[in-house]
Regions:
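Active-site neighborhood of glycoside hydrolase catalytic domains
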Residues: 248-328
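Conserved alpha/beta catalytic core and glycan-binding cleft of carbohydrate-active enzymes
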Residues: 104-105, 291, 304, 308-454, ...
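Short proline/glycine-enriched turn/loop motifs at strand-loop junctions of beta-rich domains
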Residues: 27-33
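The feature marks proteins involved in alpha-glucan
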Residues: 1-21, 46-50, 55-138, 145-150
């Protein structure tokens, strides 16, 4: 098969369809040897396309492939002979099945694809709920809908969450906060080391031979939460009922939320060295392509000034632990910035469990509100005890994480009220129930925006695990 190539478009980084052509724009020095490797998805045949240096501008290389059917091919880049996954890819092939151990046989390889939008947004209206009415319900798409009571063919997917929108709405919540729903590696991928030639014979004798593609169950650990470097432009395929239609399934979830006058807010974690241009482009992409209503940004060294001043994001809620309010545009009409940190959590826990409580500090937290900024209040988040475990355990019990109970927060300001873990004693059960109700009342009477973790409304327990990042159960 022969492909006709011309120079691409340097304005937009990534791979995308434009008419009957596909444009591939990626970072590369002019001196680099660059190739696009295309894979026919059905026939599995590969095509190596050289991208000449003449298609360079600055540190970008861009090529247009004419008469190209995006749906038939996956791709990856070869830069100086080294395989690279496109950080701007809108589809990731290879992770369609959650925690698929068979991927070890293929060395955990993934490839990229080009998304083809198929959702009509013309009638979509974003609610833009003010902070005086906003109530957050945080959930993990897979964990929220994998319970056995209502388990069905699409448990653990966007469709399952969509089916429970009315359950969330009837509790009074206005906004859904989703833990990472972009593509990330949930499996523990072995790190490859290059062994020098002079030690290879000795090294091969030391190795214990295992069956190809075999994983020792004792060494497996799933990254359930997803707070790691991700493929920030691709919807997680394993969260979809039909992985090949993941983007549209997520879009339909957002549409249904909007029809019920509810918001969709995404958590996005960016490691320290993430390119700032990529971060801004990713936020733009989710706002344009999926009409999401906000982001809870996690990570240090984020381009917050650029995000705050970005015109496209001016009506998108931004949740972060701090902001420089001096850079906020003076003509900003919509209050879209929210301080989100654990400063409410600890005074509330200390008062509820009678642990060195400072009433002045607690009262300040209860009534705090900014003139042009909101505050997110919570007593329990995914990082720490559940609300129920806060009154059932004095100490963490993270043994099942496989780290000798050394992981997770050491200071929880919790109280087991006389018995560690579940108890049959009426006095213990009654006081725990009272404390749970006190916590909910305190949270929802505070001036800030309340947030609860999915399951806290039904007294969900993690058996004292305050760092359940690898617990898929």
């Amino acid at each position: 098969m022969r492909f006709r190539l011309t120079e691409g478009n340097f304005i937009r980084i990534g791979a995308y369809k434009e008419g009957n052509t596909a444009v591939f724009t990626f970072a590369a020095q002019k001196e680099d040897e660059c190739n696009i490797v295309l894979t026919d998805i059905v026939q599995k045949k590969k095509y190596n396309i050289e991208v000449p240096a003449q298609y360079s501008l600055g540190s970008l290389r861009s090529v247009r492939i004419h008469d190209f059917d995006c749906e038939k091919f996956s791709y990856y880049y070869l830069l100086n002979g080294v395989r690279h996954i496109d950080p701007y890819a809108t589809i990731i092939y290879g992770r369609e099945k959650w925690n698929d151990c068979d991927r070890a046989k293929k060395d955990y390889e993934i490839e990229c694809g080009i998304d083809k939008p198929a959702i009509d947004w013309k009638k979509d209206i974003q609610p833009e709920i003010g902070r005086d009415r906003m109530k957050l319900y945080k959930l993990h798409v897979r964990g929220f809908s994998m319970d056995t009571v209502q388990k069905n063919k699409h448990a653990g997917t966007f469709e399952a969450v969509s089916d429970r929108i009315m359950y969330i709405k009837k509790m009074g919540f206005t906004s859904l906060l989703l833990m990472p729903v972009y593509e990330f590696e949930e499996m523990t991928v072995p790190i490859k080391h290059v062994v020098p030639d002079y030690v290879k014979p000795k090294y091969s004798q030391m190795r214990t031979e295992t069956e190809p593609g075999h994983l020792d169950k004792a060494d497996e650990k799933v990254n359930f939460w997803g707070y790691t470097r991700g493929n920030y432009f691709a919807v997680k395929a394993s969260y979809a009922n039909e992985p090949s239609d993941a983007a549209n399934e997520f879009a339909r979830l957002v549409q249904r939320l909007h029809k019920n006058n509810m918001e969709c807010i995404m958590e996005m974690y960016f490691p320290d060295n993430t390119d700032h241009n990529l971060i801004l482009s990713a936020l733009h992409y989710w706002v344009q392509r999926f009409h999401v209503d906000g982001f809870r940004l996690l990570g240090d060294k984020l381009p917050l000034t650029a995000i705050i001043q970005d015109a496209m994001l001016s009506r998108t809620k931004i949740l972060h632990d701090s902001f420089d309010m001096s850079v906020v545009p003076k003509d900003r009409r919509y209050e879209n910035l929210y301080i989100d940190r654990a400063e409410y959590q600890f005074p509330a826990r200390m008062m509820l469990n009678h642990i060195n409580c400072n009433m002045n500090e607690l009262l300040n937290q209860q009534r705090k509100q900014g003139e042009n900024i909101g505050f997110i209040n919570y007593i329990a988040d995914n990082n720490g005890f559940t609300l129920t475990d806060l009154f059932m355990y004095n100490d963490r019990h993270n043994e099942t994480n496989g780290e000798n109970n050394t992981d997770g927060p050491s200071w929880n300001f919790s109280n087991n009220y006389g018995f560690e873990g579940p108890s049959k004693k009426k006095f213990v059960r009654d006081i725990r129930a009272i404390k749970w109700k006190d916590a909910m009342l305190m949270l929802f009477l505070a001036q800030g925006v309340p947030m609860i973790m999915a399951g806290d409304e039904i007294c969900n327990s993690q058996s004292g695990n305050n760092n359940a990042y690898c617990q898929d159960n």
